[in-house]
Curated annotation (Swiss-Prot):
Enzyme class: hydrolase
Keyword annotations from UniProtKB, A to Z: Cytoplasm, Exonuclease, Hydrolase, Leucine-rich repeat, Magnesium, Metal-binding, Nuclease, Nucleus, Repeat, RNA-binding, Transcription, Transcription regulation
Coiled-coil portions: none
Name this protein carries in UniProt: CCR4-Not complex 3'-5'-exoribonuclease subunit Ccr4
Primary localization class, coarse: cytoplasm
PANTHER family: CARBON CATABOLITE REPRESSOR PROTEIN 4 (PTHR12121), POLY(A)-SPECIFIC RIBONUCLEASE (PTHR12121:SF100)
UniProt cofactor(s): Mg(2+)
InterPro entries: CCR4/nocturin_mRNA_transcr, Endo/exonu/phosph_ase_sf, Endo/exonuclease/phosphatase, Leu-rich_rpt, Leu-rich_rpt_typical-subtyp, LRR_dom_sf, LRR_R13L4/SHOC2-like
SUPFAM superfamilies xref list: DNase I-like, L domain-like
Organism: Aspergillus oryzae (strain ATCC 42149 / RIB 40) (Yellow koji mold)
SMART domains per record: LRR_TYP
GO CC terms: CCR4-NOT core complex; Cdc73/Paf1 complex; P-body
Amino acid sequence: MADGTYRFQQPGAGQFFFQTQQQQPSHQRHLVRNGTNSPTGRLKFSHDTPSPSRSPPLGQAAALNPFTMYSQTHQGQHVLMNGGQAHQRFGMQMPKFQSQSHHPHPAQQAHHHTHHNQASHNINHQHNFSSGALAAATPHFTPSHMQNGAHANVDEDIDESMNEHWQQQLQLAAESRQASSPHYYARAVAQQTKGIQIAPSQPEPQENGGDVKNGLTKVKASPRQGWYALDFGGQGLRALSTSLFSYDFLKELYLNHNKLKALPQTIGQLRKLEHLDLSGNDLTELPEEIGMLTSLKKLYLFDNNIRTLPYEMGYLYRLDTLGIEGNPLNDILKSQIMKEGTRALIKYLREEMPENPPPPDRDWVILDETAGTSTEKITVLSYNALCDSSATQSHFGYTPSRALSWEFRRDVILSELRSHDSDIVCLQEVDQGSYNGYFREQLAYNGYKGVYWPRGRAMGMQEEEAKSVDGCATFFKGTKFILLDKQMINFGQTAVRRPDAKGQDDIYNRLWQKDHIAVVVFLENRLTGSRFIVVNAHLYWDPAFKDVKLIQTAILMEEITKLSETYAKWPACTDKTAFRFSEAEGGEAQTPPEPAPSMEYSSGDQIPLFMCGDFNSSPGSAAYNLIANGRLTEEHPDLEKRLYGNLSRVGMTHPFKLKSAYNSIGELSFTNYTPDFKDILDYIWFTSNTLHVSALLGEVDKDYLQKVPGFPNFHFPSDHIALFAEFVVKGKKGKVVEADFGPQRN
């Protein structure tokens, strides 16, 4: 498993000498700690020990055994005589772990370990056998036997008066202590697969070249990963190579029975790890980065010198089994796991977790040094706030409950909005109750006015019930802008009203049922007369509905096109005076600047357009390409040959020259960050013929992210991050319309 390419010599298919029955000598780490029962002792001889001269029971077929995870094109014969090693040990070379001549099969992937009654440890080794061959395999090593032939039943050492949680600890600790020989788990798997005849595996077809049709590049298929586990057990290791942690695909890692005194911080890179065995080392503490391993289901720390655990282990919300027996653990933590088990201890660490120091502020990235002299600048912020009904412990089990509560998160969101003081703010996932009872009132103190619509489902609900329905809220500075018009686009309802929707089943079965919306506001700058279309959208999330997201985007662009042509003919605004409180007595009244006349635009695509929101589409997706390129043909694979009227028959187009604001720096690393998902979903789009971006809010500090597996947390109140950009309005292509403002001062 971890001894390099030549881990075992491969003898011919000759006579096999089965090991004799022999008691394994006690390991030095079998010392009794903390008053526990002896982990060793003479065990009864098992009559089920397999014989080389007799066929095994049918129930022990390898096809029914969790060790079956191999797909190599050679016979896996490994001679182990009386527990000795019939091979020459070679130095470990990490790059050699992946055998070049093997054809891996993804169906045989890592499975988590079973507990008491089946003390098997299934490891993905670089030697893989196909499932077809394993169906007729005969294992020479059964889960109920240790490698030395001793039976794995240690129930005699367990006090039945103990509760089930601590009984499990003692059971697993005893099993761990008997696994101290070098590469114990790898050899167990080798025994399992002895004598298997392998059918040649079929190579996976690979794409040659790339398809750039419709602006979407098809990435060449990557080879499948055929092994997922490494066994470095019993090697006497005192340190670990940093190259080990570049194998971020690993699901199982065995470092048991070595001489490690510390675990590197880079352990946090193995985020797919499900089983980590560190038993029988000299560890005194764990690094905070252990909390990054949110996929962990089993963490074995038996027989170390650990006295306390880092609070970051509270992030390990999937951890089922924490093996801590044989450590001088402090009484508080030990009582938690003894009385209530692993999950209770992890919850305790999560809920008691102190608030860590906040990260450094995100950098303000200046793209245009000359923008400071521009006559007209505008700032725009977009933020998916994660509504209260979606922020549940089942979805965000790694977040402390007090950091997940809406009362806490809304205050952090409000504080961030006020700190940026953006001219325009677009929020998604804001429920009606929070908009009317909190954000509208609080942001009014900062000079904001708001426009809000909930999602379509709120229409048929009672008033109190509808308060929990989320929607899109757009705020703008009332002293800077005049609201000329506001509209709501319901994608599903708009689709069924199309003349070409008749007989198109997919519109009704897939699109109409989704009640996602976009809010459109038409604004005018009081001083300059420039007009802006601001779109705030939230699209469907499910990756299995790529066609729905694409059609929602197409409908959005189609409706914006219609509205923009209407707005191009919008009459001039005659009353631009902003409301002002009367001056206090004795105060000098400041004369407001003279407002410029309203701008008129020759066509809808000449009006500056901002399109913000959570589009749930990453760069390169069909929805992204439609917005960025202005067209998408009817043959796009994301449509899956579904019927959406003219949109799927003719194709999709729009007249705007849209560009993502963050494309100026190659997009952010992510806009959505959770343990299982990290991608770019949110955008601020702008029309590049009327605007250009001059500055952006940069990345989240990378050092901070090394210890944070996902958002929300105490510093980031949503699983999304805020996007914030500054724009400069280009020279106006429209003509000035003189408006009658009444009598003027001389």
